[in-house]
């Protein structure tokens, strides 16, 4: 479909058009000159540009990472040395070798999940061979000797 042609009889006369332009020039609406910004600082800081949110077409990792420190990964094995046996008998305390990355709260939760016992507190130390030892003090309503029997330490 071709554009509609303008009717030659409706063309405005040149005098009216010139008067219209003269009026616009006189008011100054056509000649707006942008003023130059005066720089007072020596260093030039690049202006901040628009940063769009990331919208990836596909995830960059194939599968979400699994939790490597579950209760089985935290508690490696119970310690059965003579001093550990003395702790079981005298202080109501179980001694475990635990993962180096495990903290006291995770150790406490792991013992609760594995053996269904409440712990009073957990003390940890890192041995010279680089492993972490945890002293798990049980609450008075649990006997460490019975728990050690159930676990199979004794």
Curated annotation (Swiss-Prot):
Q: Which GO terms describe its molecular function?
A: mRNA binding; rRNA binding; structural constituent of ribosome
Residues of the region (Disordered) are 1-39
Kindly give the InterPro entries that the UniProt entry links to this protein: Nucleotide-bd_a/b_plait_sf (IPR012677), Ribosomal_uL23 (IPR019985), Ribosomal_uL23-like (IPR013025), Ribosomal_uL23/eL15/eS24_sf (IPR012678), Ribosomal_uL23_CS (IPR001014), Ribosomal_uL23_N (IPR005633)
Q: Name one GO cellular component term.
A: cytosolic large ribosomal subunit
Q: Where is the composition biased (Low complexity)?
A: 15-26
UniProt entry keywords in alphabetical sequence: Ribonucleoprotein, Ribosomal protein, RNA-binding, rRNA-binding
Q: Which residues form the signal peptide?
A: none
Gene3D superfamilies per UniProt: 3.30.70.330
BP GO annotations: translation
What does this protein's UniProt record list under function? This protein binds to a specific region on the 26S rRNA.
The similarity annotation says: Belongs to the universal ribosomal protein uL23 family.
Q: What is this protein called?
A: Large ribosomal subunit protein uL23
> Per UniProt, what is the name of the gene that codes for the protein in this document?
RPL23A
